[in-house]
Regions:
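Conserved N-terminal phosphate-binding loop of PLP-dependent enzymes in the Aspartate aminotransferase
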Residues: 1-230
């Protein structure tokens, strides 16, 4: 079984969806378990209830989904999760597709002071070029090598070159610090501009990957109109 945190987003493959989504079969999500992020007692209980049945836990480094304010885990949360996974032989997987390189060039797990067993990157990895990466600990290589996987663009040299150039550039510029500074400047400016026009804007999450919403807009219609006008 695989543990997911409620409110997650891990792409659109059927196994990452909920059963009530169109086209998703019961068999594809039969082994999915769900629990609230940052609720360690609930996670501990879930591990106890399904002891010996859980193979992996997949998560974003912090809750940075849409339609809800983003938030960080409590201090020490990830360290407790890491130990819980170790004690139960569960693979800890971090989905760093969106947040990767924005918080720490070594990965968002490094930012929070723990080490994932598997971590995946995309988006910022090559500044928009079509390449992604799955990194993990040495002991999992033999397991992964036994999984059948193929692709049409593995010999595309340009995305790989772009990825190497992008990573070198990010190291040179210390982009996590730069993105944080620029993000704070941008979100502060947007909130101030909103106030000047009678709107209460709320910015949450990392300044380099912020979520912005209009307060008291339960239907999100104002938000959609605003985005459309931009």
């Amino acid at each position: 079984k695989i543990v997911f945190f409620n409110g997650y987003y891990h792409g659109v493959s059927p196994w990452t969806q909920k059963l009530d989504y169109s086209g998703v079969l019961e068999e594809e999500v039969a082994n999915n378990l769900y629990v609230n992020f940052n609720d360690y007692p609930a996670l501990e209980k879930l591990f106890s209830d399904y002891k010996g049945e859980i193979a992996g836990l997949i998560a974003q480094p912090y809750m940075h989904g849409n339609f809800n304010d983003n938030f960080f885990p409590d201090e020490g949360y990830w360290q407790k999760v890491r130990k819980l996974c170790d004690d139960n032989g569960v693979v800890l997987i971090i989905d760093d597709v969106r947040a990767g390189f924005r918080m720490d060039l070594a990965g968002s797990d490094h930012y929070f002071g723990f080490k994932a067993d598997l971590i995946c990157f995309c988006k910022a990895l090559a500044n928009g070029y079509n390449v992604s990466a799955l990194c993990g600990r040495e002991s999992l290589k033999d397991v992964v090598s036994g999984i059948t996987f193929t692709g049409s663009y593995w010999m595309s040299a340009v995305p790989f070159a772009a990825g190497i150039a992008c990573i070198n550039k990010m190291k040179k510029l210390n982009t996590p610090k730069l993105f944080d500074e620029l993000g704070r400047e941008l979100t502060t400016g947007l909130v101030k501009a909103g106030q000047e026009h009678g709107f209460h804007l709320i910015a949450s999450g990392m300044p380099s990957l912020f979520y912005l919403r209009i307060a008291d807009d339960d239907s999100l219609m104002l938000h959609q109109e605003w985005v459309a006008d931009m």
